[in-house]
């Protein structure tokens, strides 16, 4: 099956929040992305609401329910009590749990699964009882023991952190090394019964090689690069380009 594309709207929200104005509209840009073929929308609401605001979530939920009922809403975040309540209110199809400190600019490392096993088991169990698919953020070189914990706590998927790959893409030797890590980790996860997502610093240029090396990839979530490209090419054309890259 082709890799699914979930468009992360955080960068759109950050641009909006530079001024006390209602535009660019997160919902309107989400509608364009879905209309161009994106399979879903992703947001990462942080406690300080510096990009996505809590008030955005019901509007995105309604957009998908009313106009694109075959698409998915993915909410990322650290599983604090406030976050879990927000998710339960919004009812996304997928919840991606990340080990971020609230002050971080972006997610930049995966879970230490053995260290946080009990904590994750409680959070994942709570979400699964509500019927959500749960993905856990994982380092690109997470080993079998770590991934086995992800499976044991009830996760459906892991999202592989692709930041190191994106950072060295212009260096063929380093990029090849990172791809081998991702390929190995994805195969291990799949062998344990975990589906595999990926995200962070993915671009229309580096996506095809990732898809080639990780054929089991279920979904990528892309925000910063896609939004930057949308400033030049428009959201609809940019989404079409990323969808083509997912099929390369």
Curated annotation (Swiss-Prot):
Active site feature: 44, 76, 200
Pathway: Cofactor biosynthesis; pyridoxine 5'-phosphate biosynthesis; pyridoxine 5'-phosphate from D-erythrose 4-phosphate: step 5/5
Gene Ontology terms, MF aspect: pyridoxine 5'-phosphate synthase activity
One GO-annotated biological process of the protein: pyridoxine biosynthetic process
Catalytic activity: 3-amino-2-oxopropyl phosphate + 1-deoxy-D-xylulose 5-phosphate = pyridoxine 5'-phosphate + phosphate + 2 H2O + H(+)
GO CC terms, sorted: cytosol
Pfam families membership: PdxJ
This protein's UniProt keywords: Cytoplasm, Pyridoxine biosynthesis, Transferase
Binding site for 3-amino-2-oxopropyl phosphate: 8, 19, 201, 223-224
Family recorded in the similarity comment: Belongs to the PNP synthase family.
Function: Catalyzes the complicated ring closure reaction between the two acyclic compounds 1-deoxy-D-xylulose-5-phosphate (DXP) and 3-amino-2-oxopropyl phosphate (1-amino-acetone-3-phosphate or AAP) to form pyridoxine 5'-phosphate (PNP) and inorganic phosphate.
Subunit record text: Homooctamer; tetramer of dimers.
Protein name: Pyridoxine 5'-phosphate synthase
């Amino acid at each position: 099956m082709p890799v699914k594309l979930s468009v992360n709207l955080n960068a759109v929200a950050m641009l909006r929040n530079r001024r006390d104005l209602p535009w660019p509209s997160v919902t309107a840009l989400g509608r364009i992305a879905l209309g161009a073929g994106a399979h879903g929308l992703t947001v990462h609401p942080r406690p300080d609401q510096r990009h996505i605001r809590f008030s955005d979530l019901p509007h995105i939920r309604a957009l998908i329910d009313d106009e694109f009922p075959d698409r998915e809403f993915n909410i990322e975040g650290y599983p604090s009590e406030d976050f879990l309540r927000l998710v339960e209110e919004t009812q996304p199809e997928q919840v991606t749990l990340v080990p971020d400190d609230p002050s971080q600019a972006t997610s930049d490392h995966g879970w230490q699964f053995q260290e946080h096993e009990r904590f994750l088991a409680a959070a994942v169990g709570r979400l699964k009882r509500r019927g959500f698919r749960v993905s856990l953020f994982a380092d690109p070189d997470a080993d079998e023991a770590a991934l086995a914990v992800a499976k044991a706590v009830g996760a459906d998927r892991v999202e592989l952190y692709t930041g190191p790959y994106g950072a060295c893409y212009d260096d063929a030797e380093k990029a090849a090394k990172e791809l081998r890590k991702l390929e190995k980790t994805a195969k291990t996860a799949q062998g344990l019964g975990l589906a595999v997502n990926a995200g962070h610093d993915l671009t229309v240029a580096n996506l095809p090689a990732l898809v080639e090396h990780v054929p089991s990839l279920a979904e990528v979530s892309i925000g910063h690069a896609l939004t930057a490209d949308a400033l030049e090419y428009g959201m609809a054309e940019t989404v079409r380009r990323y969808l083509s890259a997912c099929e390369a």
